[in-house]
Amino acid sequence: PDALTLKEAMIYGTGGLTAALSVRKLEKMGAKPEHGPVAVSGATGGVGSISIAILNQLGYEVIAFSGKTEQTEHLKELGASEVRHRDSVNEVGKRPVGRELWANAIDTVGGEYLANLLKQTKAGGAVTSCGLAASAEFSMTVLPFITRGVSLLGIDSVFIPLTDKKDIWQRVATDMKLPDLEKYGEEITLEQTPEYLDRFMASKTVGRYVVNVRG
């Protein structure tokens, strides 16, 4: 879109596109800010951090889940109303359903986190799934689906039609465009990439990184 520079588009990248698709899918299921908070797992990651910022811009209350509690202030600056340790979502344990704690959720990590987000989503709510950093598998009962009408929504940012990609990029360039966008992406050189990949594998990175191949 004309309203985005090339660098701004790369700050969003696939992760930002996935975040925008996740928010849009919740909207299509009827999500509104007045329904209650949206939980976001993997909050300091590329998808999670942009999801928080977009949701906040659209007026939603956000509960951020992260293992990096030292990043609490950063997450609140992005727009999180509350920051909780990621493992607190699993306190529901083996129970088939838990207390209804959020209206909707965006899950970026999979595994038991996805299952337990679903168990604690309010009746009629939805949870999007776009990642598997924790696990590609999860186990739960069907009770959240058949007793609360909770929906599990898959997010695909690769094989969706180009018309859909065009539509969501237009929203990213308009009502979903974040102010001071460059603060969401740290620019690094191509030579620094191996170092940052090591940090990523050690779970020591936060947010988005843009590689300047000419730097």
Task: Give residue spans per PLM region.
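Glycine-rich phosphate-binding loop and adjacent beta-alpha segment
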Residues: 112-178, 213-214
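Alpha-helical segments flanking ligand/cofactor-binding loops in enzyme cores
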Residues: 52-53, 73, 115-118, 143, ...
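N-terminal Rossmann-like NAD(P) cofactor-binding module of classical short-chain dehydrogenase/reductase
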Residues: 103-106, 128
